[in-house]
Amino acid sequence: TFYLGEFFGWNFAYQMIGIIVIFLCFIFLILIKEPTREIRPPKDFFKEPLGWFEDSFLAPLKDLYLRYKNHLLLLLLLIFTYRLSDMFLGPMAMPFYRETGFTKIEVAEITNFYGLIMTILGGLFAGASVYRFGLSKNLVAGAILTPLTNLPFIYLNMIGHDVNFLILTITLDNFTQGFVNVMGVTILGTIVSKSFTATQFAFLVALVSVPPRIVSGGSGIIVDNMGFHEFFIICALLGIPAIIFSIMAHKRRQELGFE
């Protein structure tokens, strides 16, 4: 996108990206076959509205509650806060790069292309680490790494335009993002029941999407009133609740199935 924006303008860049995404989605829809599975006929909404509502919504939530009971609040708080620090920083990353003096080409090459590679490597490392050390320890590690890897942005803001330090910052931040993304998906995959996978997964993903909706609007306000230095400090501090909840989950890993 940044390469196209640099040479052809943003209007052309976004049009081309939209066309490419639609084309790829169309190809995948054609090529990927749905898995064969036994489908239980759902209750008719018009004939049995209460039964339909119970099967579609109440039963999955009831199952989630009955399986975790006293630990459900901890799980929801962990899901809600686990990536809060990165979600708060995300909307202001691009304005920060531009204000610091990085060109579109530098942003494209370092934060997008190289950053994507580091995100993939972080995800692969997370999968191997979960296999070797288990889920709960890696949850704690991811919660600690997230605010720590936000701190280099503070120094980058102090020194200004420095390509080498931007590469180091993106290396640490995107690798951790890939690691934490896998942890987040693993949490959801561990919590959901096979009988209600779709509904429970949709509910939990919706819960995960709440933090960015709440906090992203405040990012720009804080930057305007306090500056990027204080903003990045706040981003790091927002990672503290996730550390606390992940440690609590680690202590209850047997009950939660996070071993």
Model-identified regions with their sequence ranges:
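Helix-loop-helix hairpin linking two adjacent transmembrane segments in secondary transporters
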Residues: 1-32
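Helix-to-loop junctions at the C-terminal end of transmembrane segments
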Residues: 5, 121-138, 223-224
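C-terminal membrane-cytosol helix-exit motif in multi-pass small-molecule transporters
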Residues: 20-41, 245-250
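Short amphipathic helix-loop junctions that connect adjacent transmembrane helices
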Residues: 91-108
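Intracellular juxtamembrane helix-capping segments at the cytosolic ends
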Residues: 178-193
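A late C-terminal transmembrane helix in Major Facilitator Superfamily
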Residues: 195-225
